């Protein structure tokens, strides 16, 4: 993220009021934490200083580096990590975390309430009482008091349990961004300090893996290299952070993600409709997006494809009401045609999910197919609210859907 974007974020975050809640947050949640005004008196904290940021990053990265280099053997020997990222500060995560701390409630908000556009968001909380003393070094207890409960066999497939949930988020290899907030307040006559840290991408994904076992830095993601400061961690080369490796062309008849690596065939996929897409940026690349009104539509024409094992035209996207809680009134219809064949109508996706997911269907047909997908909003007679439609990857995969 460049300096200009940081300035924009800072301006928005400092001046927001509920009625001016950012459009993205209104889309992601009916009650986004960032847009929820504080109803308590903040006696201390209220922001994280530059010195505090360094303490937070050093604390996290030192602990991650300890595990990644195979030096965590206090209770049981934990294997070294091949792909553990060095954490960086994120202003947007911090702004949402500060808004959470300002609620003066020692309880997690929900995933949608702390959601941001770039990635899923995890969260760790700590509350201290007695005096208004802010010490970010204390958050190391998320690691030190729970590491003894995390056994090597819990790593893959990852098994979640509350006894080590803070620890597993701290050491989750693919998490590379952190942002925190802090607030001191009085509750029932007792002085308390609430520390909130939000993480992206979120960890604690059941069935996944906390980290890849192997020699330190032996499996660093694209656009990262072994850190000079923390030799067990993979450090981002550019502000965009770790990048996803493009899938093998052996598995895909066509794969496009709006990057410079897209093959020329991606330009043969046409996108026409009521209004053109606009292009937006994520850490991991670009995506196209648009808000459509009643009766409007967008057609993605993939063209003709053939595969002996069947094929799946797909979008990695999301759609639904532009304001969370309003009526879902849109769908993606799947259209297929081939000479002398009639395919059933009514094949469609109607789930209004705010997370990125595969939109598509596998067709068990080994002859050439003409494929198009149509996003559409219900007609004006139904009085639907505006609906958004966006996707970051598209293509055709042989034999299965991504």
UniProtKB/Swiss-Prot annotation:
Q: Does the keyword Secreted apply?
A: yes
Q: Where is the signal peptide?
A: 1-13
Q: What is a single Pfam family found in this protein's UniProt entry? A: CAP
Alphabetical list of Gene3D superfamilies matching this protein: CAP (3.40.33.10)
Q: How is it modified after translation?
A: Contains 7 disulfide bonds.
Domain SCP span(s) in chain numbering: 57-199
What does the UniProt entry say about where the protein is found? Secreted
Name of the protein in its database record = Cysteine-rich venom protein
Origin organism of this chain? Tityus serrulatus
